[in-house]
Regions:
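Juxtamembrane helix-loop boundary signature in multi-pass membrane transporters
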Residues: 1-13, 101-160, 269, 275-288
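Loop-to-transmembrane-helix transition segments
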Residues: 7-15, 58-82, 150-158, 206-226, ...
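Transmembrane alpha-helical segments that form core, pore/gating elements
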Residues: 12-33, 53, 107, 143-201
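Hydrophobic/small/kink-forming positions within alpha-helical transmembrane segments
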Residues: 16-20, 24, 73, 77-81, ...
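Hydrophobic/aromatic residues within transmembrane alpha-helices
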Residues: 29, 86, 112-114, 172, ...
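Structural motif at transmembrane-helix junctions in multi-pass transporters
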Residues: 31-35, 82-98, 174-179, 230-247
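Membrane-interface helix-cap regions at the ends of transmembrane helices
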Residues: 45-62, 133-145, 190-212, 260, ...
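Specific alpha-helical transmembrane segments that line the substrate/conduction pathway
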Residues: 88-114, 240-260
Length: 288
């Protein structure tokens, strides 16, 4: 039992680091958002191949694990595409705070249906994770305004999709003997939505972009794919109600550190509070 506890936290920490580095550099591109999605979906393929090699290409093809794992991928990737729509109608400072607390859906579903329980110290860790999420979601500025109320609908869809995703990921892990199969189906789902992403653009194909820029974006996006891969393991060995808020709350800490080193960007007061809260919840969960 103790080994599993260490395993889930190690995998979660890999996710936190890779997502943190990814977040620090993901905006440093001139590519349209929909083409960034295409590159991200393609970056899932090498990780999926590594997963297949790890299980000697013995993919779990039973209907229940396959459908649940595909659902995980569609909820995550579909939510990302809907987020693009939300950002077309409202600035990030309105959209992101609403989406950032999506793990509350995971926590509630895990309590109700998975019967997951944590100690009083663990509850404190979850609360601190949400404090960090809110602090990092607070805007540095509030320039711009919403173009239409429809952004609330789109943001709500993302909130629900991403909140349910981690819960379904736990169900998928419980239904299959290996985490690798779950990730492979997630990658398939992401690739299947590439045509949808292309339709959301202005008609410019991905090959019309410079290969240098595409290569740079690919190496940034593969960090997200690696983080998603290790998140599946963290979710398998840990509790969904802990893993989801922990990963989402702590990745911005890495982003802040990188921004401080590279751009001398001093964290705001809310970000400092978020950093302290996030580090505190990691220390708490290391004992959970």
């Amino acid at each position: 039992m103790a080994e599993k506890k260490h395993n889930w936290l190690l995998y979660a920490l890999v996710t936190i680091v890779t997502w943190g580095v990814w977040g620090a550099f993901s905006d440093q591109t001139s590519l349209p958002k929909n083409l960034v999605y295409v590159v991200w979906a393609l970056s899932m393929i090498p990780c999926a191949i590594a997963a297949l090699i790890n299980i000697k290409f013995k993919l779990d093809v039973r209907s229940k694990p396959a459908l649940l794992s595909m659902a995980v991928g569609l909820l995550g990737a579909g939510g990302q595409l809907v987020l693009f729509l939300a950002l077309d109608y409202a600035p990030a400072y309105l959209v992101m705070p609403m989406i950032s607390v999506a793990p509350i859906v995971t926590v509630l579903l895990s309590l109700l249906f998975l019967k997951e329980r944590v100690s009083k110290l663990g509850i404190l860790g979850i609360v601190l994770a949400f404090v960090a999420l809110v602090c990092f979601a607070l805007p540095d500025n509030t320039d711009g305004a919403a173009k239409s109320w429809i952004w609330i609908v789109y943001a709500s869809v993302v909130f629900i999709c991403w909140g349910i995703q981690a819960f379904v990921m736990k169900l998928a892990n419980n239904s299959t003997p290996d985490a690798e199969s779950v990730f492979v189906y997630m990658a398939i789902a992401a690739v299947l939505l590439i045509p949808v992403a292309l339709l959301m653009g202005d008609g410019s194909g991905i090959t019309s972009q410079g290969w240098g820029e595409l290569t740079k974006v690919f190496f940034v996006q593969i960090l997200n794919a690696i983080g998603a891969f290790t998140l599946v393991y963290a979710n398998r060995y840990g509790k969904a109600m802990i893993v989801a808020p922990l990963a989402d709350a702590c990745a911005p800490v890495i982003m802040c550190v990188i921004s401080l080193i590279l751009y001398a960007a001093v964290p705001t007061v809310p970000q400092i509070i978020g950093i302290v809260a996030a580090i505190s919840c990691v220390l708490i969960f290391s004992r959970e």
